[in-house]
A protein has these predicted regions:
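Extracellular jelly-roll beta-sandwich "head" domains, especially the C-terminal globular C1q domain
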Residues: 10-13, 17-167
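Low-complexity/repetitive intrinsically disordered segments
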Residues: 1-6
Length: 167
């Protein structure tokens, strides 16, 4: 029962509940370089589908994780890439998050080099998962796709994002 020999009910978190959650879809595409070869990152647009708890807010390509919580963020997507590297077929992309860009780049890099396949165009699965701790202040996330080593066109990026407030 609720009281008695089994004791009082526990705090939030028991039986798999959480403080709040957010589910959305993601989309973007575009050239990741300028004519002179300089990088041109492309922001990932976020569309809220459902949420509970009010701990996550979005605006265009920005996601705000409200302070006072620890969040689990998972992105699952598909992306189509095309090389523009002078008939070599090489391409490379990576994602940034506006929070820890160095880690994010290393964790998400997709690269094709060494094989000479002119005009290559490939579909890749993309996944990213990490914990963000917003103990003292809100965390503004801005996910962007950028080229890494080679001129690359992002023909499409479509996926989902799930955010869970763990406490």
């Amino acid at each position: 029962g609720e009281k008695g020999d089994k004791g009082d009910k526990g705090d939030k978190g028991q039986n798999g509940s959480c403080a709040g959650w957010f589910y959305g879809t993601l989309w973007t595409k575009g050239d990741l370089y300028k004519e002179d070869g300089a990088e041109r990152p492309v922001g990932i647009k976020v569309y809220k589908e459902a949420e509970s708890g009010g701990f996550v807010s979005t605006y265009m390509d920005e996601i705000y994780l409200k302070k006072g919580h620890t969040y689990s963020v998972t992105i699952s997507a598909s992306m189509e890439l095309q090389s523009h590297e002078d008939r070599s077929g090489n391409y490379s992309v990576q994602m940034t998050d506006n929070y820890d860009d160095g880690f994010c780049r290393e964790a998400t890099r997709i690269k094709r080099d060494g094989v000479k396949l002119p005009y290559s165009r490939d579909q890749h699965h993309f996944s990213f998962s990490r914990i963000y701790i917003a103990s003292d202040e809100d965390i503004p996330l801005r996910f962007k796709i950028e080229q890494s080593s080679y001129k690359t066109t992002l023909l499409g990026f479509n996926g989902t994002i799930t955010i869970t407030a763990l406490d």
